[in-house]
UniProtKB/Swiss-Prot annotation:
SUPFAM superfamilies: SAICAR synthase-like. This is Phosphoribosylaminoimidazole-succinocarboxamide synthase. GO terms for molecular function: ATP binding; phosphoribosylaminoimidazolesuccinocarboxamide synthase activity. Belongs to the SAICAR synthetase family. Its EC number is 6.3.2.6.
Length: 237
């Protein structure tokens, strides 16, 4: 499938149209950003690692009965995906306290959250992705109650699948972000799942193995991503 015109350029991915109006090409770049794009750096191999990581995870979720936009792996840094009508709200599942939750509530980083928390954020970089809730979604018409309920159901199902996958590899799935869209009226998981949009800690050392290494200037970003990929069985080379 040949990519045609650039449709959208995000912080780390570029989206292209194809000759099929229902299919797009996602290109994963080497860019890494923090602070809503205020800080951007390039890391060799990052686009390839995230692309293959995402394809692997989406395949696992499909096997578990979670519909995703994934069609096929095209190259080291490109995948073919279904064109979704994206919901402007993203879902976050939290198994342990970290990131904005710690800042917002003043709680200790790393405490277990049982049952896991489910948060919603409006996708708006200019407004720093403000936190919203179900009533906002209904009032502003961002997503129907039925589709939002399905998004929540699929987010928790993904959490069950991925917590076990990472847990078996000696990793803690601390939290993660999911984005959904509609394809022929069905709620489908879109965007990506990678260490860019999740927090993953080593079970033994609690070392951070995700984009917090970049956000907090810890170094070793790609080495951490590749280590996580290796542990869960992603074939990179």
């Amino acid at each position: 499938m040949q990519k045609l015109a650039e449709l959208y350029r995000g912080k780390a991915k570029t989206v292209y149209t194809t000759e099929d109006p229902d299919l797009l090409v996602l290109e994963f770049r080497n860019d890494t950003s923090a602070g809503d794009g205020a800080r951007i750096e390039q890391f060799d191999r990052k686009g390839m690692v995230n692309n293959k990581f995402n394809h692997f995870i989406m395949s696992k979720l499909e096997e578990a009965g979670i519909p995703t936009q994934m069609v096929s792996l095209l190259s080291d840094n490109e995948v073919l995906v279904k064109k979704l009508e994206m919901v402007p709200v993203e879902c976050v599942v939290r198994n342990r306290a970290a990131g904005s939750l710690v800042k917002r509530l003043g709680i200790e980083e790393g405490i277990e959250l049982n049952p896991p928390l489910f948060d919603l954020f409006l996708k708006n970089d200019a407004m720093h992705d403000p936190m919203v809730n179900e009533s906002y979604c209904k009032t502003f018409g961002w997503v129907s109650e039925e589709n939002l309920a399905r998004m929540k159901e699929l987010s928790y199902k993904a959490n069950d699948v991925l917590s076990k996958l990472f847990g078996d590899a000696g990793l803690i799935l601390v939290d993660f972000k999911l984005e959904f869209g509609l394809f022929n009226g069905e709620v489908v998981l879109g965007d990506e799942f990678s260490p860019d949009g999740s927090r993953l800690w080593d079970k033994e050392t609690l070392n951070k193995m995700d984009k917090d290494r970049f956000r907090q200037s810890l170094g070793g970003l790609i080495e951490a991503y590749e280590e996580v990929a290796h542990r869960i069985g992603v074939k990179l080379d």
